[in-house]
From Swiss-Prot:
Expressed by the venom gland. The keyword Lipid metabolism does not apply. It comes from Agelena orientalis (Funnel-web spider). SUPFAM superfamilies: omega toxin-like. This is U2-agatoxin-Ao1t. Keywords: Disulfide bond, Knottin, Neurotoxin, Secreted, Signal, Toxin.
Length: 70
């Protein structure tokens, strides 16, 4: 019985500490995530299509991974 009560109290404490992420904030995508390029590693975003931010073409390495050609 004590174990059940302790478990319930711990669960309540954990859920009260964790704040839910607002839906609007969680669904917002940055410009890069919507279809831009990932310039820090010269990899194209999967949604960017056959281009990079700098105008270079993307080479498809896998379905989700493409690399900018210089």
């Amino acid at each position: 019985m004590k174990a059940i009560i302790s478990l319930l109290l711990i669960s309540a404490m954990v859920f009260s500490i964790i704040e839910p992420v607002p839906k609007k904030k969680g669904l917002q995508l940055s410009e890069n995530e919507r279809g831009g390029c990932l310039p820090h590693n010269k990899f194209c975003n999967a949604l960017s299509g056959p281009r990079c931010c700098s105008g270079l073409k993307c080479k498809e390495l896998t379905i989700w991974n493409t690399k900018c050609l210089e």
